[in-house]
Design a protein with these regions (language model features):
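Pre-Walker A (Motif I) flank of P-loop NTPase domains
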Residues: 21-27, 50, 239-242
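Conserved RecA-like ASCE P-loop NTPase motor core of nucleic-acid helicases/translocases
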Residues: 51-58, 242-249
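Interdomain helical connector at the RecA1-RecA2 junction of SF1/SF2 helicase-like NTPases
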Residues: 147-241
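SF2 helicase catalytic motif II
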Residues: 98-144
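Conserved pre-motif I regulatory segment
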Residues: 1-29
């Protein structure tokens, strides 16, 4: 019994173990969906005789690890020395608490979040109180692009990256599926009205007639084109899947929350 890893994560884990022989802080940078959480889980399982701490940005990620424990045929009782915490709560951790709680190993899930002003306070206290602690960090995006492009793999792990796989590399190797891009126009009436208004303002009758014919042809093609409902029916094969709709701003998002109900009504 134990934690099974995919081939690419087995290779990464071997590199993690090798690097820990010389370093106290090791990072893994793999894309979302590649199973890097199982690398963390295996490391915690292999060090279950030590005092371990799993830190994550949200309760959802903590709960995900617990689900991984159970899906691996294990129980929380197999991790008697493991504690869980989330960065927001850990930010206010006291020196007194850390003096009474010694940790040998810590996992920093989505470690780029540790660069946040408040959340970093608790992490810094933890590392200062435990200078010899072993730290495993996992992230898909170690660069904080909106924070002066800080590289948290450099700041927290001194560049000790045991394994790094880019999203493009993961797709090329078959670790992640290659997305299929389907294009469709769902909102064109406003543009058609603008073109019609321009045509109506033309004074050259020949040009006016020519552009009107082109616009009429475009309208006919759009009328015969599949709507989003049909496109979704054709290309979404998993009705129970999770889907995300990107919007340009909050106002657009509120508008689209109602609009997308029509898109998905025949799917789920």
């Amino acid at each position: 019994m134990g934690v099974e890893l995919y081939k690419h994560n087995k290779v990464a884990y071997e590199k993690v173990e090798k690097m820990f022989e010389k370093e106290n802080r090791v990072a893994v940078v793999h894309p979302t969906g590649s199973g890097k959480s199982f690398i963390s889980l295996k490391w915690l399982y292999d060090n279950r005789d030590k005092k371990c701490l799993f830190l994550a940005p949200t309760l959802a990620i903590r709960d995900q690890l617990i689900r991984h424990i159970k899906s691996s045929g294990l129980e929380l009782s197999d991790f008697k020395n493991l504690e869980f915490a989330i960065y927001p709560n850990f930010a206010s951790i006291t020196d007194e608490f850390l003096e009474q709680h010694h940790y040998d190993c810590v996992v920093l899930d989505e470690f780029h979040r540790c660069g946040a002003t408040e959340w970093s306070k608790g992490i810094n206290k933890l590392l200062n109180h435990n200078p010899n602690i072993k730290v495993l960090g996992v992230s898909a995006t170690p660069i904080r692009y909106l924070d002066d492009n800080r590289n948290m793999a450099e700041e927290l792990f001194h560049g000790n990256i045991a394994s790094e796989i880019s999203l493009a590399e993961a797709m090329a190797k078959g670790i992640l599926p290659v997305p299929t891009y389907i294009q469709g126009i769902y909102s064109f009436q406003e543009d058609l009205d603008k073109f019609q208004a321009r045509i109506d303002r033309l004074t050259d009758e020949d040009a006016k007639s020519r552009f009107q014919d082109l616009l009429n042809q475009a309208k006919k093609r759009l009328e015969n084109a599949d709507g989003l409902e049909e496109i979704f029916k054709k290309h979404i094969t998993d009705p129970s899947g999770k889907y995300i709709v990107f919007c340009k701003d909050t106002a657009h998002m509120r508008l689209m929350m109602e609009e997308t109900k029509k898109w998905f009504k025949d799917i789920n």
